[in-house]
Swiss-Prot record:
SUPFAM superfamilies: Radical SAM enzymes. Binds 1 [4Fe-4S] cluster. The cluster is coordinated with 3 cysteines and an exchangeable S-adenosyl-L-methionine. Binds 1 S-adenosyl-L-methionine per subunit. This is 7-carboxy-7-deazaguanine synthase. S-adenosyl-L-methionine binds at residues 87, 130-132. Residues 32-214 form the Radical SAM core domain. The keyword Lyase applies. GO terms for biological process: queuosine biosynthetic process. Belongs to the radical SAM superfamily. 7-carboxy-7-deazaguanine synthase family. It catalyses: 6-carboxy-5,6,7,8-tetrahydropterin + H(+) = 7-carboxy-7-deazaguanine + NH4(+). Catalyzes the complex heterocyclic radical-mediated conversion of 6-carboxy-5,6,7,8-tetrahydropterin (CPH4) to 7-carboxy-7-deazaguanine (CDG), a step common to the biosynthetic pathways of all 7-deazapurine-containing compounds. [4Fe-4S] cluster binds at residues 45, 49, 52.
Length: 214
């Protein structure tokens, strides 16, 4: 399956498939960990990470979905910062228009992505690239995404992940290493050792899971 065939076209120009929305809560991962945010979790992801914590390891056919208008989504927002996650947000052709619509309300927007797909989102939007090519070789990171990313977050499950991506990491872009949650008794010590060897990088610990908030 190529990237072009995976892009989901909107039912209307101002709508998009949504799995769930929630907030205010805190961002638990990456550069903005601890910030108060609202989440818009878009439906759908073909990447198939085996440890996916949002239900898409098998493609997510059982997950809830609803086509929502931008205006309805914006009415629900309560925080100054909005995180658009998934699933994989960049499979949706309507993503750039959604980001623009939220931006017109004066809110900051961050987008979480595997980087396998590309849409030209506004320059002011924050893009968190969490590459998954090492577990899904059929979905390599789009080269444009390495140049566009505002931060890179690498999930550490076996320890070799950093070696896979280190040559692609853009100079000056914040990089965080995040231990895979389900095996954290093993992956947290492993991640700490990697950080000692690469002290320019930072630790991401999925703070929301430790605090047991959405």
């Amino acid at each position: 399956m190529n990237a072009a065939s995976t892009v989901v076209k909107p039912v209307s120009a101002q709508s998009i498939p949504v799995q769930e929305t929630f907030g205010p809560t805190i961002q638990g991962e990456g550069y903005w960990a601890g910030a108060v945010v609202d989440f818009i979790r878009l439906y759908g992801c073909p990447v198939g990470c085996p440890w996916c914590d949002t239900g898409y390891a098998d493609g997510g056919p059982q997950l809830p979905r609803a086509v929502r208008t931008f205006s309805d989504l914006i009415l629900e927002l309560k925080s100054p910062r909005v995180v658009i996650s998934g699933g994989e947000p960049f499979i949706h052709a309507a993503l750039p228009a959604l980001v623009e619509a939220i931006g017109r309300t004066g809110r900051a927007v961050a987008i979480e992505t595997s980087g396998a797909f590309w849409q030209p989102v506004p320059d002011w939007a924050w893009v968190t690239l969490s590459p998954k090519e090492h577990v899904s070789p059929r979905h390599p990171v789009n080269p444009q995404m390495w140049r566009r990313a505002n931060e890179v977050k690498i999930v550490i499950a076996g320890g070799a992940e950093l070696d896979v991506y280190r040559r692609f990491l853009p100079p000056g872009v914040p990089v965080s290493l995040q231990p895979e949650w389900e095996a954290r008794e093993r992956t947290l010590p492993l991640t700490l050792e990697l950080l000692k060897a690469h002290p320019r990088y930072r630790l991401s610990v999925q703070l929301h899971k430790y605090l047991q908030v959405p």
